[in-house]
Amino acid sequence: LRDWWGLWEADAYPRMDLVVASLDTAYTTKQENDPSALTVWGVFSGDAASSIATGFVNRSNRMRNNEREAARFDQGAKIANLLPDDPASTPRIMLMYSWTQRLELPELVQKVADSCKRMKVDILLIESKAACMSVAQELLRLYGREDWGVQLVNPGANDKLARLYSVQHLFSEGVIYAPDTTWAEAVIGQCEVFPKGKHDDLVDTTSQALKYLRETGVLVRQPERIAEINDSRVHRGKP
């Protein structure tokens, strides 16, 4: 799994289309427990054509690009004509930031809020389990008017290992990047030894974020995107 991470060597991150934070809560300082953990992930387009297609898919069948391209689509051009057959057009994911720390509830809420503000997060993901509800409620009560929103995520019936396996293909396809930092190494290291490592808090946040992005259609690969758009244009009569 380590070899599948792409190394981001540039000094700055690219412009992100979406920034998602993923939280695994503990809000206890007991040393025998996993600490709370937060990872921040950015989605960025491979090229301009990807932005065109993404804008179409994610905005209820309305093109956000210029009028010329919109006219081409209205005249019956396939989206494949706008999106070159290039792997670079697949959206990429960047691990932008992470931390782990044992904190009581007030300190945890404050640190999460500060992180979301500093990283310009759009959505904060929190697992919808009983242990996380107090954190979610406090964040909504104190920071409900901030630019970032809180999204509760149902993990479903799958266990932690199954959830990570469900997004493993994203790593093998080479679309996930991380900078050369100590905090990024902590995330990569936990993923590498999972499920045999001492802690798995960062792994949980990783699978939660990637699974959310995949299931909400943000991380759609080029062939899937073309098929979806072309399929949406097929006229279906009444049964």
Model features per residue range: what roles?
Residues 7, 210-239:
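Acidic two-metal-ion nuclease catalytic site recognized across multiple nuclease folds
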Residues 1-25:
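ATPase catalytic-site recognition across NTP-hydrolyzing enzymes
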Residues 23-36:
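An active-site-proximal beta-strand-loop segment
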Residues 26, 129, 206:
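Anionic group-transfer/hydrolysis microenvironments
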Residues 32, 118-121, 176, 200, ...:
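Intrinsically disordered or highly flexible coil/loop and linker segments, enriched in small
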Residues 191-223:
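Acidic, Mg2+-coordinating catalytic module of metal-dependent nucleases/exonucleases
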Residues 37-39, 44-194, 239:
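Mg2+-dependent endonuclease catalytic cores in nucleic-acid-processing enzymes, primarily RNase H-like
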